[in-house]
Amino acid sequence: MAVRKLVPETAPVVDDAPASTSVDHKRSLAHKLLIELLSYQLALPVRWIETQNELLQWPETIQRYVEVGPRTTLVTMAKKTAARRASSQIVSASKLSTLKFLCTSDNTAEIYYEYPQESGAPVEEEGSKSDAAAPALAVSGSSRTATTAKATVTTPSSSSPETAPPAASTPSQGTPAGGSTTPDIPLSAKHVVLAMIAQKFRRAFDNIPTQKTVQELSGGKSTLQNEIMGDLAVEFGQLPDGGEYIPLDALGDALQGNFPGKPGKQMSSLITKLISRKMPGGFNQAAMQNHLEREWGFSKAHGQVVICLAITVEPESRLESADSAREFLDGLVSRYASYAGITMTPRGKGNVSADHSSAVMVDESVLNGIKREQRDYQIKELELLSKHLQLDTAADDAVLNELRASQKSLEEKLDRWASEFDDKFFSGIEAIFDARKVRQYDSWWNWAREDTMRLLSRMRPGQLPLQHLQEQGLVAQLLRRWEPSCAEIVQNFLDTGECKEPFLATAAEILRLGSDALKKSPVYRFTTPSMKPRTVISATGCVEYSEVPRENSSYIALLKQGLVAASGERVPYVHLKKKAPDQAWRYDAQSTEILLEALGTGSGAGLTFSGKTVLVTGAGPNSIGAAVVRGLLNGGAKVIVTTSRSVSSAASFFQRMYRECAARGATMAVVPFNQASKRDCESLVEYIYGAHSPVDGDLDYLVPFGAIPEKVELSKLDGASELAHRAMLVNILRILGLVYKEKEQRGLRTRPTTVIVPLSFNLGGFGGDGLYPESKIGLEALFNRYFSGNWSDYLSICGAAIGWVRGTTLSQSIRLLGEAIEHANGLDVITFSQEEMAFNILALMTPSIAETCEEGPVYADLTGGAKAIANIKDVMAAARAKFLKESSIQKALLAERAYEQRVLYGSESPRNDTSSPRPRLSTKRARLSLEFPEVPSKSDLKAHLVDLQGMVDLSRTVVVVGFSELGPWGNARTRWQMEHLTDLTPEGYIEMAWIMGLVEHFQGHLDGKPFVGWVDAQTKQPVADAEFKEKYQAHILAHAGLRFVEPDLLGGYDPSKKEFLQEIVVEEALPSFSTSKANADAFRLRLGDKVAVRRMPESDEYLVQVKRGAHFFVPKAVPFNRGVAGLLPAGWDPLRYGIPEDIVQQVDPVTLYALCCVSEALLSAGIRDPYELYRYIHVSELANCLGTGAGAQSAAQRLYKKRYLDHAVQSDILSESFLNTTAAWVNMLVFSSTGPIKTPVGACATAIESLDIGCDAIRSGRSQVALVGGYDDFREEASYEFAMMNATASSVGELAQGRLPREMSRPSTTTRGGFVESAGCGVQLIMNAELAIEMGLPIHAIIAYTQMAGDKIGRSIPAPGQGILTAARETSAGHDSALLDLAHRRKRLTDEVDAVHQWVTQQLAATRGPAGWPDRAIDEIEATALRKIKHAQHAWGNDIRCQDPSISPLKASLATWGLTIDDVQVVSMHGTSTKANDTNEADVISQQMDHLGRRPGNPLLAVCQKALTGHPKGAAGAWQLHGCMQMLQTGIVPGNRNADNIDSKLRQHRHIVYPMESMPMPQLKAAMLTSFGFGQKGGIAVVVAARHLFSAMAEDELEAYRRRVAKRQREADSAYVSGIMSKSLFKAKEVSVWGKSDASMSRMLLDPKARVGGHPENNNNNNNNSSSKRNTSIERLTRLLLPSQKPETEASPEGQQSTSLTASIQALLASQSTTRPTSTSIGVDVEAISSIPMGNAVFLERNFTRSERDHCFSSPTPQASFAGRWSAKEAVFKSLQTPSVGAGAAMAEIEIVSDGGVPKVQLHGRAKEVALAKGIRNIQASITHSGETVTAVALAESSPMC
C-alpha cells in the first residue's frame, strides 16, 4: 500500500499482487514494479523522505532493501534513517536490526542467495539454546558466514553488570588436533567499533561499557566525539546520522550490513602501528596470526578479533623478543576469552602423546661423521675464500700467538704484584688530584658584611647579653676581617637609633676598633683556657670522659712550668732542641726562649700570617691540621689544604672553616690529593708552582700532616701498612724533593720553604701500630740530609715531635687514657687539646723561628714530657684494666640494687625514685596547616607602626590573599622549610610523603583492628607521624629538588642517550619486511622507484624492500651534558589531588600543575568554594592572568615530533598547545568567570608580568579579583636549546668539578656556570583590600608596586638589560618632595574630606522634599561622596606620583605606607647563576639604591632562591614572591646554601650582602624582587608586610576582621586536611555559576549587580519590612553626614571637629525649619566622650534612667557608653523639632535602650506628648563611636498633617 500511495502509476501492479499465487507470476509482477519505480524516479521528483518513512513502518513485512545502481547511495540513506528511527524509538531497534540493505554493485551473491559450499554436520537444536548466552562480540558478520562447530560457552565471573557482553550465536566446528575446542567467531563491526573507541579513550577493551554512547564516554567533549566519528567514517564509510548518540552495541549492528569482515583502512593503520612500535623485529601480523592458530586453534577470521583488540592493551614499551610477544598474545587471549564468555585452552595443554611417537632415533657415530664432514668442508671453504681475498691467515695466527704471549707476560707481572702487595695497596695509590675540582675561597669581604649584620641583630633589646658576644669571639673575628663597608653598617646602626644601652657603647667601640684594625695586619690570637682530661665512672658503670679547667688556666704559664729533667734543670713542656757535638739533640734554652716569646705574642697581641703561603696536608675534621689551618686563616694567610675525601663531601667542612675563620686577605684552596700517590704528589707541586697557582707560585711553609691510622702487629703487616708507610714517609720526602726542584728551576733561593716535619714521641712504645714508628723515625733522617743534600738553600727543616693530643680522629680510641698518661709514673706529664697543639705549631711558623731554622734544622719537642714515659704501653694497659674493673664493680652494685628493689617493691626501681626516669617515646602528632598569617591587634600595631587610618583607598590597594606553588620541593610550605631550615619539619615530611605517593590515609580495619591514620603505600602498614623522617627522608632527598633527570618522569627521556635522526643513503638493498597495504603505498609514494612492493600470497599484507639509493632517517643517540634538573618530586600524581582521569589524559602536564596550584591557592585564601567569590563580585570582575614562558611543551612535542613520527596523538592536540589553554581549563573547571583571560608571555619574567597585569586590572577597577602567576615545564627540546645558547650549567662539566646535582645552581658565586632548569607552577590570588577585608580573607602581603620594562637597541634576545632602572627614576626636586611626608599628606586629605562633607550637607538640604529624602537622591549623593573621598585618598595616599611625577615610583609606592627606600630590607634576586645576569642584576639594584639615596651601611640582604629550586622560567617570579611573603611573615631571611664563594666582582656593590645561612630579621617591613626574562623582559615588584594595611583600619573593623579570618582558617585547615586524606583537594565544577539554563546565564551576565545567592550581608534584600528600610536609611544618612574621624595621634584644637560638625548640621536644620511639617525629620549630635562628667551623680540621675545607668556602668568603657546615649538623646530631641526649655532641662524622658545591641528610643512624659502631638509614630537612632568622639543620628517619622 505504501508504494501504491507514493507512486500511483504502480496501482495496477500492486492491486494484482495479492491475488497472485504463482511464483512465476510474482516474479513478473516484481519485474513490472521495478520498471515502474525506475521510470518514476527518472521522470518525476523523488520523494525519498516520504518513501523511507513509509517503507520503514513495516519491518515485519519488508526485510530486504535492494538498490539497483553503481553505488550504495540510496541504501546508505535508508540505513541512516533506520538508525535514527531506532535511536528515537519510533520503531523498535530489535526489529530494525533484522533489516538488510543491499546493493547490486556490492552484494550480488546475497541478492541472488548464492551460498558457499558447506561442510560438516548441521547445527544441532541445542546450539540455538546457547546462542542467548554468547556475547555480542561473537555476532556473525553477515548472512554468508560459514556454519561451523558449536563452542562451549561459559559466563565469566569477572564481567561487571556495566560491561557484561550481550549474547550472540557461535556456530560449531570440528575439534582441533590439540584437543581444545575453539569457536570460530569472525571479525564483526562490533569488534572494530569497540577496539577503535577503546584505543581512543586509552582503555582496555574490557573496560568500555558497550551500552553507552560515544557522547557519554567522551564526557561531552565535542572535539573528541568528532575525532572518533571521523575515524569510524574512515573505517566504515558512511555512518548513521547521530551515530555518537547510539549505544556501541547498536552502532556495531548498524554498521554490520556493509562490513566486509576484515579491518578497514583505519584499523589496519592502528594494527600496523602496534606492530611497528611495540612488537620485536620480524614479529609481524602473520606471525601473530600463526601463533594464535597453532597455540590456540584460532581460525584466521577469529584471530583478527584478537589482533584488533590488541591495540587497546598495547605494551608500554617495545617487547624485546618473540617469546615476549607470544606471552603478550597469550595474556590477551585469556583476557578476551573471559570477556567474550568462552573457554579456551592452549593446544600445548592438550593430548601431547602423539608428539612423542614422532621422535626419531639417530645413530651417534653417523651423526658425528656428518658433523666432521661438514666441518672439513667449512675449513676448506675458508681457505679458498682467504686465498681469493688474499688474506694471510698464517700472519694472523702469528699476531694472535704474540698477543697470547704478551697476555701471559702481563698475567705473570700481575701475579707478582698481587703476591707482593694486595688490593688495599693497589687502590690506595690511585691518583685523585684534579685541578678542575679545586675549591677556592676568597670572599672574606662578604662574610665580614654578613657577620656585621648578624652581630648587630643580636645587639637589640631582648637579644643575647653583651658578655655572650665577647665569649663567642664574635667581635674579635669581625675585627680580623674588618673592611670599610663594615664601618658603614655599624655607623648606620648607631645613626638610626635602633641601638640601646648597654649595646650602644659596644657598637661605638666596635666602630673605633674596626678603624684601628684596618691599619694593622690581621692576627691569630690564642685565648682558649687550658683544660685537662678527666675520666670517671658514672653511677651506671659507664666510663665517661670530660675536660675540666686546669688549676693554672694560663696556657703559657703552664708551658713554662715544665718538667725537671734528669740533670735537675727545669725544661718547659714545649721547647726547642739543637744537635750537640755528640750528635744528640739537647735542650737549647736560647732558642726555646724565642719559641716562648712567640707563644706569648700569640696569646697576647697575636700572630700574623698576612701574605704567607702555606700548604697543609691532613687537615680533616678533628685533626691537628684543621686547627692549624684555622689559625692560619685567622692570621690572613693564603692556604692550600688537601683532602683525600671527595671534594663534594669535604667542601662543606672547609667552606664553613673559611667562612668562620678567614681574616682580611686570607684565601684557601681545597685540593683533592692522595698523599700515598706518586702522581698526585707530582701534580700537586706542579699546580702550586704553575700558572693557576692559588699561592702566587711559591710556599713559605709546608705542613705535611697527612697520616693513615694503623692497628696491626709486626706479624700481620700487609699492603695497608706499606701504604701508610708510603704516605707518611716516602711521599713526604718526595714532595720535599719536588718542591726543591721547582724552586731551583725558578731561582727561588732567597725564600726558603720551612717544612714542619711531623714527628712523634711514639717510637714503638705503643705497640700494635704497624709501621707508624718507623715512618716517624725515618723522617728524622732529614736532620742529617739537610747537611748532606743540596737543597738546604731552598728548604728549612723544623721537626715537630707531637705529644699526646686529645680529641683527634687518630686518638679517639685512647682518649679515655689521657688522665692516666698525665699522672703516669709521677712524671707530671701534660696532654694537649687540638687547639693547644695547633698553637704550638703556629708558633713554629713565626719569622723568628723561621730564621732559626735557616741556620740549621730545629727539633721542637712538643710532647709535654710524654717522651719520658718508658713503659707507656703498660701504663695504658693498667689504666684500661682499672676502668674496666671499676666499671664492672659499679655495674654489679647497680644490678644488686635493682635486684633488691625488685624483691622489696616488685619492680626494679623504688616508687619514689626519679633519679633515672625512663625515656618516653614522642607521641606528638603533626599538625597540617595552611599557615595563615597572623593578624595583630590594634595595640600591637600602634606600638610599632604609624597610624594610616583613613589615608589609603583600600578599594585600589592590591593584596595577596592566597598563594600556592608546585615545584621540585613540593609546595610552598615544604620549599620554605628547605629554604630556611635546610630540612623538613614533621609536617613537611608528611606533606612530601603524600605528594610523592609514599603514604596514604587509611580509615577502616587493619589487621583486624579499627585504624585511622597514615599507612605506607606499598606495605599498607601504619606509619606514625614521628616515623616519617626516619622512613622516608632518604627517599625524599634522593627524588626531590635538583637531581639527575629521572627518565620515568619524562616519558623515557634519558639525557645520556639523547636521540637524533641521521639521514642515510642505502648502499645495498635491505631485507624485505611485511606491512599493510596503506603503509606499502606510503613507502612507494615517499621512496618511489627505490622501493619494491609486492603482495604476500594468501594475505592482506605486503612485502616491502628498500633498494639501493634510497635515503631515509635513522635514529641515533648521543650523550647530552645537561642531565640535572629540578623535576617535580618523583611520584607526584594529579589523580591524588582529585583531578579526574579524563582530564589528566586530555591536558598538558602544565595544566595539571596549574589546576593543583589553583585549588590549593583558594584554600590558602580560606575559600573552599570558588563560587563564593560571586557572592561579593560580578562574574565579570575576576581576571585570569596566568602566564607561561614556553607553554605546553609536552603538547607541542606531541604536535610536532610525535605527529611527524606517526605516533598516536589526540586529534585536538593543537588546542592543548596554545599558550592560553591552561588558563582556559582553569576557568572551565574552577571559576566559570566571564572576566578577561589575559595570558602574559614574559619568558623567565612571566610571573611578574602576570602580577603586573593583575594589579593594573584591580587598581583600574576593571576587576576586583585576579588570578596571577606563571608555569613552565622541563622538556628535552627546550633543555637542548638552552644548552646551545650556553645558558644552562653543564652537568658533565659540573660533575668533573666535583659538584653534586644540588650544588650546580650557584647564583652570585665565583664558579657559577649557568642555570639549572626546573619545572613547576606558582599562583597567587590577588584582590583589592576592601573586598579581602569584607570577605575575611587572610592578607599575606600588600603588592605596593609592580613594573615591567624593556631595554636598549641590540641584537641579542637573551642579553640582560637595565630597563627597570626606570623604577627609580627621580629628579632632585622629587627627592625632597613634601608629598613624601605623611603628616603633610594627611592634612591635605583631611581638608578635602571636610570639603566633601560640606558638599554632602548642601546636597541633602537641596534635595529634601516634602516626604524626606528620596532613596535615589541618597544613592546619588552617597556614591558621589564616596567617589570623591576615594579619589582624595588615592591622590594623597595610593598614588602621590599623579601629583608629582618627579618622585620615584619605588619611593612613592613605599610612601603610601609610611615607608622609605631604607625600609626595604630584602631583595629576592632573579639570580639565575649565569655570569651575565648575576653581575648585571647587582649593578641595577645598586644603581637604584644609590639614586634613591639609600643610606650607606644599610645593605639589602640578597635571597637567591634558585640555588635551591633551579630556574622554573615562567614560575620563577611567583616562587620569589612567595618567599618574600614568607620572609615578611616569619622574620627570617633564608641564606643561599650554595654561595660557597661570592664573586669578587660583586664586592663593589655595597648595598647588597649575600648571606649563606638564614638570618633572623624581626619586623621586616618590605621586600623587593627583581626578574629578568629573555626578550627584554625586566620586572620589579615591591611587597609590604600586611600589618601596614591593618594600621589603616579602624580598631573595631580590625577586630571584626580578625574574627572572620580565624573562622576561615579553621574551616580551610579542616578542608585541606580532609582533601589530603580523601584525595580531593581539587574539585572540578560540573555546572557554571549561573546553572545550566541559558536564560539564567543571560540574566547574570547582563545584570551588573547579579550575585550568587545574594550578598551575605544583604540576605534580606527582599524583605519589605519598613523598619528594616528605615534602619538602612539611618545608617546611610549617618555615613553621609559624618566626616572621617581624625586619628587620635593627630593634634587638633579641642572641640574643633565637634563644633564644626554641629554647626553644619544646625545650619541644615535651620534651613528646614521654615518649611511645612513633613513626614520625616532628622537630628544629629556629636559629643566628646570626655565631656560627660562621670563624677557628677546628679547629672547622671537627672538625665539617665536607672536601666540606662545600669547598662552603661556594666560596659567595658562606661564613659563612652554614657556619651553615646547622651548624644542620642540630643539627636532625638532635635528630630522632634520642638522648642527647647533650656540647656539645663533633664533628658531622662528620652530613654535609649539596647535591643540586641541596636539602640531603641522610648519616650516618656512631655517628650512623648510632643511626639504624639506631632504625629510621630517611630523614631530610629544610630550611635557611632570614633576615637575620642561619639556621634548620633535620629530619624523621626510621622504621618503627614492635613
UniProtKB/Swiss-Prot annotation:
Q: Which residues form the active site?
A: C1244, H1470, H1511
Boundaries of every Carrier domain copy: 184-262
Q: Where is the composition biased (Low complexity)?
A: 140-175, 1658-1668
Q: Does the keyword Oxidoreductase apply?
A: yes
Residues engaged in binding acetyl-CoA? 1725-1727, 1761, 1770-1780, 1823-1825
Pfam families for this protein = ACPS (PF01648), Fas_alpha_ACP (PF18325), FAS_I_H (PF18314), ketoacyl-synt (PF00109), Ketoacyl-synt_C (PF02801)
The Gene Ontology CC terms held by the record are:
fatty acid synthase complex
- Assigned EC number: 2.3.1.86, 1.1.1.100, 2.3.1.41
Please provide the record's keywords in A-Z order: Magnesium, Metal-binding, Multifunctional enzyme, NADP, Oxidoreductase, Phosphopantetheine, Phosphoprotein, Pigment, Transferase
Q: Does the keyword Magnesium apply?
A: yes
Where in this protein does the record put region Beta-ketoacyl reductase?
Answer: 611-807
Q: How is it used?
A: As colorants, MonAzPs are widely used in various food products for centuries. Moreover, MonAzPs also possess wide-ranging biological activities such as antibacterial activity, preventing hypertension, lowering cholesterol levels, causing hypolipidemic effects, and displaying antiobesity and antitumor activities.
Per the UniProt entry, what are the Gene Ontology biological process annotations, in alphabetical order? long-chain fatty acid biosynthetic process
UniProt region (Disordered), positions on chain = 120-184, 1649-1672
Q: What GO molecular function annotation could you give as one example from this UniProt entry? A: 3-oxoacyl-[acyl-carrier-protein] synthase activity
Residues bearing PTM O-(pantetheine 4'-phosphoryl)serine: S222
User: Its annotated pathway?
Assistant: Secondary metabolite biosynthesis
Binding sites annotated in the UniProt record for Mg(2+):
D1725, V1726, E1727, T1824, H1825
Please state which protein family the record places this protein in: Belongs to the thiolase-like superfamily. Fungal fatty acid synthetase subunit alpha family.
Q: What does this protein do?
A: Fatty acid synthase alpha subunit; part of the gene cluster that mediates the biosynthesis of azaphilone pigments (MonAzPs), a complex mixture of compounds with a common azaphilone skeleton very widely used as food colorants. PigJ and pigK form the two subunits of a dedicated fungal fatty acid synthase (FAS) that produces the side chain fatty acyl moiety of MonAzPs, a beta-keto fatty acid. The chain length control of the pigJ-pigK FAS is somewhat flexible as MonAzPs features either a beta-ketooctanoic or a beta-ketodecanoic acid moiety.
Share what the entry says about its subunit structure, partners included. [Alpha(6)beta(6)] hexamers of two multifunctional subunits (alpha and beta).
- Full protein name: Fatty acid synthase alpha subunit pigJ
Gene transcribed to yield this protein = pigJ
